[in-house]
UniProtKB/Swiss-Prot annotation:
InterPro entries: Asp_de-COase-like_dom_sf (IPR009010), Asp_decarbox (IPR003190). Its cofactor is pyruvate. Binds 1 pyruvoyl group covalently per subunit. It comes from Mycolicibacterium gilvum (strain PYR-GCK) (Mycobacterium gilvum (strain PYR-GCK)). Gene3D superfamilies: 2.40.40.20. The gene is panD. This is Aspartate 1-decarboxylase. The keyword Membrane does not apply. One of its GO terms (molecular function) is aspartate 1-decarboxylase activity. GO terms for cellular component: cytosol. Belongs to the PanD family.
Length: 134
């Protein structure tokens, strides 16, 4: 049996741009892609913290160090510049690997710079001003 597990997430990134007239996808700063172990073309789910919208798309590489989180194509109807989003990637693991796998969890600041990098999906950094689910 394979289990679909959290592979990585970028938590509470700020959308910097939205372009309705683009072929699709989400543009992500290459530094954030590295931190979250995302590859160009990899499927991600985007959750908009501000309005609850959820969608599935794929990642394209943005300029390194730019902080870009760009919503492209039809998704720009749902997610707008300034919105806070969570980008989530999942992986399929066999049962043994799923029980020991540690995801990449990336918290960012308002400029989409890495604040904290860890493996606990429920961890909340002190600077995040969020409630821990634990």
């Amino acid at each position: 049996m394979l289990r679909t597990m959290l592979k990585s997430k970028i938590h509470r990134a700020t959308v910097t741009q939205a372009d309705l007239h683009y072929v699709g996808s989400v543009t992500v700063d290459a530094d954030l892609m590295d931190a979250a172990d995302l590859l160009e073309g990899e499927q991600v789910t985007i959750v908009d913290v501000d309005n609850g919208a959820r969608l599935v798309t794929y990642v394209i590489t943005g300029e390194r160090g730019s902080g870009v989180i760009g919503i492209n194509g039809a998704a720009a109807h749902l997610i707008h510049p300034g919105d806070l989003v969570i980008l989530i990637a999942y992986g399929m693991l066999d049962d043994a690997a799923a029980r020991t796998y540690e995801p990449r969890v990336v918290f960012v600041d308002a400029d989409n710079r890495v604040l904290d990098l860890g493996a606990d999906p429920a961890f909340v950094p002190d600077t995040a001003e969020l409630l821990s689910p634990r």
